[in-house]
């Protein structure tokens, strides 16, 4: 390790212990504790300003935590400099060195570590991202997608213990983004490194990651496998940030076997006990739009239902989205798959019934903050 | 004058990340700063202080060329009463030269930024290249071009467009020389600001206003204002202090304050205090004008 | 105002003629202005072939054009000595100003410290001060103050003065380059195991280098062509511009035209050559 006496070898899970980062006027990361198992693809998901990028920068060593510890395995990395950590970053704007060729960009890290075969390693990394033919070019001569791959190769070539991706696909157009998502996932499976992916795009996080952590106001709201989190959000924020939800504030008034009975703005709805993080008092009732059916007549034997008036119909190809005003004045959203040759012909102003299986409903603690989210729907359900 | 130079720092950071600049130890900053700052202190600030004290000195009676420390405000009074017209000419000629330079520079800068395409670099070089032929040589060449028997004067005389019959040794020659000599200082900042301007905004302006002139007045010109501001200062300041053009192209009736300062220092025995007072007054006037100008057109980019 | 009308980008049919004119107007005006810039240079060139008698102001049809001044550019007494002096001063002043100014620029862009605003003002004000005031103040200090420490007007006082006014221009040029650098490049380097000194020499410095080279070229041309400040602080030393100015009354020798035009030609060739090379390297 020529010229790099301070470099710390470390292997194992990445652990953040009670990490806090405060700036002059606000706390970006607030007492965060987290374990990322070795070899997993982990996504930090959240809106801008939630502290996810600051968390990433602290892992990289570009920021130092105000308090708390950052470890890989049993090695404490807190306080060490970025060049001393077995961690590499794919920057949001790629930050490729404009004065170096693609090959020299990729060989930069191995050269700094004094590896004799730096150029050979660089060429192998370029093979991995399928760009060996562009090795002699300068970054300015590459397209956005190609630059992105070079940035990935430049980080990967070092075989870091943890690879950090800071919104790496943000600058790409939709089609290229989808393609790169698949590509990154393939590379991660191939090399088996720990990937930490910061993004505000919930679809991207869910497509790629084994584990997703949703951050808000410097804290983790919920963490888990994407499917589980989508199916059963535990906070109103997650219910709206990960997918959309029809939500309504109410209170729990009764139980019915393994179900809770809640009164939501004058209507009675049921929530499975296992699907509610509150079991008494104030609750936020929720159901996902694609779980809600739209019917002309009041249906029987499905579950709970509510009457409403269609306000908007938008055809999106695989499905049709209905926006329905329920009696409380709130707007519910529902998706119907376009299975029939002639779909139900509904127009704004038509009266309909919305219905769902009560097993699909969920309950989360009430949260004023959720009202700020765009798709929150304050609703009252009528039996 | 970083309008010449101002380039938006590549701020593409996510809003979550605060300034990526780590707070570095200021000791290193002072080490970097020290040599240059000391140089500027010793060879700029201290000389100015000295100039100010000289401007208040008095002559030893009977010993021409010898002075004693004093607070002789009369030097400033003399500077104004005896050489008021020279101050007036300096400001007037410099103002005219700045205006003409703007009129000539803008089309050139505009063509460089928007019409030149791959010739941009070449044009840039061409604007700077004349600098390498000595400024004095070029000014002497203007004297030849504008001479009574030269092409410009003879043409104008044939057309009866030249009232006095000649250009050299008139204010016209001096203003022409000043305009010429400082033109590149006007072109480059305007070009820099036009080049930096977002061309799409100008296109949008072209869509909104059918009239090309309206687009120019409401969109293009305001966007190039930082460059125009820097350019006018970079032209006006050296022009107001110049004496070479007045010396080589003008006559006794077109002498500017620079000529007076130069001759008081080098050709008038005991002229030091007056010359210093004149210099200091000139600097004060120009700094005041710069200050008012920058205030009026408002830019913090200048520093 | 003789400013150009920009093209209306999607002109309605009726406006197209006006747009066409506006389009050409800028180009035509630009070519005319460039011609204006070069006209005196052309005169300097032509009169370098003049077989003049007493003063090289009027064209002498007898024996002109002649190559004799080009064959013997040092033929006039003092002309080549003044050129050498100017070149020496230019090189020394440029080197010193580039070092001092680059350090200053790094301090101002990359660091937060007390007195930063004051430092910015200290760098800016010399550029906003007329040369004659700079020259006058230096003259008073050299004659009345620094002469006590053994500094006499001459070669070194010119060098010191030139360093002073070049520093500000170096700072402005290098600062612009530094500010345009993405700070994330430094972070990326550190992330890729580069120590702070590695980061500086492998990333920051190569990226700032074009700005430093530009600053050096600017400094050299400012120093080489300076007359006003030089005339105040030069004493008996003669630089090339001072040589031309002083010999104006007696008659400027055509050798000065030869040298003046050659400097122009050399600079033009160097710059064009340089841009061709850097253009090829980019491709």
Named regions from a protein language model:
Chain C
Residues 2-47:
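N-terminal signal-anchor/first transmembrane alpha helix
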Residues 4-7, 16-23, 55, 66-78, ...:
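Interhelical loop and adjacent transmembrane-helix boundary motif
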Residues 35, 39, 84, 88-100, ...:
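Hydrophobic alpha-helical transmembrane segments of multipass integral membrane proteins
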């Amino acid at each position: 390790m020529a010229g790099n006496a301070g470099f710390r070898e470390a292997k194992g899970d990445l652990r953040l212990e009670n990490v806090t980062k405060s700036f002059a006027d606000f706390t970006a990361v607030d007492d965060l504790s987290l374990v990322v198992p070795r070899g997993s693809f982990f996504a930090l998901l959240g809106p801008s300003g939630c502290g996810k990028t600051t968390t990433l920068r602290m892992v990289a060593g570009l920021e130092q935590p105000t308090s708390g510890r950052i470890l890989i395995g049993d090695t404490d990395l807190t306080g060490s400099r970025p060049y001393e950590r077995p961690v590499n970053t794919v920057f949001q704007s790629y930050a490729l060195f404009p004065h170096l060729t693609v090959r020299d960009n990729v060989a930069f890290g191995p050269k700094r570590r004094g590896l004799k075969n730096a150029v050979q390693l660089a060429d192998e990394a370029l093979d991995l991202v399928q760009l060996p033919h562009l090795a002699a070019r300068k970054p300015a001569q590459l397209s956005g997608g190609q630059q992105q791959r070079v940035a990935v190769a430049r980080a990967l070539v070092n075989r870091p213990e943890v690879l950090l991706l800071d919104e790496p696909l943000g600058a790409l157009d939709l089609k290229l983004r989808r393609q790169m998502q698949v590509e990154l996932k393939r590379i991660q499976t191939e090399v088996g490194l720990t990937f930490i992916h910061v993004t505000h795009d919930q679809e991207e996080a869910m497509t790629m990651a084994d584990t997703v952590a949703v951050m808000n106001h410097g804290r983790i709201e919920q963490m888990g496998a994407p499917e589980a989190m989508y199916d059963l959000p535990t906070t109103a924020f997650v219910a709206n940030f990960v997918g959309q939800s029809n939500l309504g504030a109410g209170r729990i008034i009764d139980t019915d076997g393994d179900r809770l009975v809640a009164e939501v703005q004058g209507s009675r709805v049921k929530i499975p006990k296992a699907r509610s993080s509150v079991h008494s008092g104030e609750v936020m009732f929720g159901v996902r739009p694609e779980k809600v059916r739209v019917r002309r007549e009041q249906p029987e034997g499905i579950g709970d239902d509510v009457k409403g008036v269609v306000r908007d119909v938008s055809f999106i190809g695989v499905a049709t989205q209905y926006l329905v005003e329920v009696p409380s004045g709130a707007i519910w959203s529902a998706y119907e798959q376009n299975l029939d040759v002639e779909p139900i012909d509904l127009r704004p102003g038509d009266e309909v019934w919305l219905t769902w299986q009560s097993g699909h409903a969920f309950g989360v603690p009430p949260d004023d903050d959720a009202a700020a989210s765009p798709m929150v729907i304050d609703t009252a359900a009528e039996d | 004058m970083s309008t010449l130079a101002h380039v938006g720092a590549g701020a593409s950071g996510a809003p979550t990340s605060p300034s990526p600049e780590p707070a570095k130890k200021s000791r290193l900053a002072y080490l970097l700063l020290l040599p240059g700052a000391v140089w500027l202190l010793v060879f700029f600030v201290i000389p100015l202080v000295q100039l100010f004290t000289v401007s208040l000195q008095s002559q030893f009676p009977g010993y021409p060329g010898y002075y004693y420390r004093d607070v002789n405000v009369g030097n400033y009074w003399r500077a104004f009463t005896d050489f008021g017209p020279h101050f007036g000419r300096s400001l007037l000629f410099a103002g005219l030269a700045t205006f003409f330079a703007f009129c000539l520079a803008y089309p050139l800068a505009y063509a460089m930024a928007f019409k030149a395409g791959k010739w941009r670099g070449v044009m840039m070089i061409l604007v700077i290249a004349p600098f390498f032929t000595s400024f004095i040589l070029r000014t002497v060449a203007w004297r030849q071009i504008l001479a009574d028997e030269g092409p410009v004067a003879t043409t104008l005389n044939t057309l009866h467009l030249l009232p006095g019959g000649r250009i050299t040794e008139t204010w016209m020659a001096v203003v022409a020389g000043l305009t010429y000599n400082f033109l590149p200082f006007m072109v480059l900042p305007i070009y820099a600001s036009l080049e930096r301007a977002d061309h799409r905004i100008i296109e949008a302006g072209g869509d909104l206003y059918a009239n090309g002139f309206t687009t120019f007045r409401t969109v293009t010109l305001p966007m190039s204002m930082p460059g125009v501001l820097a350019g006018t200062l970079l032209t006006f300041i050296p022009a107001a202090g110049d004496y070479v053009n007045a010396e080589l192209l003008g006559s006794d009736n077109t002498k500017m304050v620079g000529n007076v300062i130069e001759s008081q220092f080098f050709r008038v025995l005991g002229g030091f205090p007056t010359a210093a007072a004149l210099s200091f007054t000139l600097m004060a006037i120009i700094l005041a004008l710069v200050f008012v100008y920058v205030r009026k057109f408002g830019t913090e980019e200048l520093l | 105002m003789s400013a150009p009308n920009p093209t209306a980008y999607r002109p309605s049919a009726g406006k197209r003629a006006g747009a066409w004119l506006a389009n050409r107007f800028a180009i035509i005006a630009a070519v005319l202005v460039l011609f204006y810039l070069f006209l005196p240079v052309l005169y300097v060139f032509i009169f370098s072939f003049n077989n003049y008698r007493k003063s090289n102001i009027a064209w002498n049809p007898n024996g002109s054009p002649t190559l004799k001044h080009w064959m013997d550019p040092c033929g006039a007494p003092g002309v080549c000595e003044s050129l050498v002096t100017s070149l020496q001063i230019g090189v020394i002043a440029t080197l010193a100003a580039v070092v001092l100014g680059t350090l200053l620029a790094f301090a101002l862009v990359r660091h937060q410290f007390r007195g930063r605003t004051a430092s910015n003002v200290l760098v800016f004000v010399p550029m906003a001060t007329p040369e004659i005031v700079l020259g006058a103040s230096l003259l008073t200090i050299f004659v009345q103050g620094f002469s006590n420490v053994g500094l006499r007007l001459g070669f070194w006082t010119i060098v010191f003065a030139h360093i002073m006014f070049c520093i500000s221009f170096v700072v402005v040029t290098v600062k612009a380059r530094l500010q345009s650098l993405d700070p994330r490049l430094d972070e990326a380097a550190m992330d890729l195991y580069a120590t702070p000194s590695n980061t500086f020499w492998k990333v920051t410095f190569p990226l700032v280098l074009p700005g430093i080279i530009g600053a050096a070229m600017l400094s050299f041309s400012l120093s080489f062509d300076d007359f006003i400040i030089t005339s105040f602080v030069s004493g008996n030393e003669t630089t090339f511009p001072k040589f031309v100015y002083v010999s104006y009354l007696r008659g400027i020798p055509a050798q000065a035209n030869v040298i003046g035009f050659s400097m122009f030609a050399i600079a033009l060739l160097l710059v064009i050559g340089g841009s061709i090379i850097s253009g090829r390297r980019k491709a």
